[in-house]
Amino acid sequence: MKINELDVVRLKDGREGAVVHIYPGGKAYCVEIADNYGQTLDLVGAEEKDTAAVI
């Protein structure tokens, strides 16, 4: 699966967020998890194996 910056992804743990940074090599990326008001709740590092879908 190809993941790009600003894609919205669903992680295998059920959280959804926007990819805000892809690390060199493209194997890991940073996902911003936000609430309904757009406030950032968490920034998590993830890999393709942690991703259920690009939505």
Where are these regions (language model features)?
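Basic/aromatic-rich interaction segments and small domains that mediate binding to polyanionic partners
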Residues: 2-55
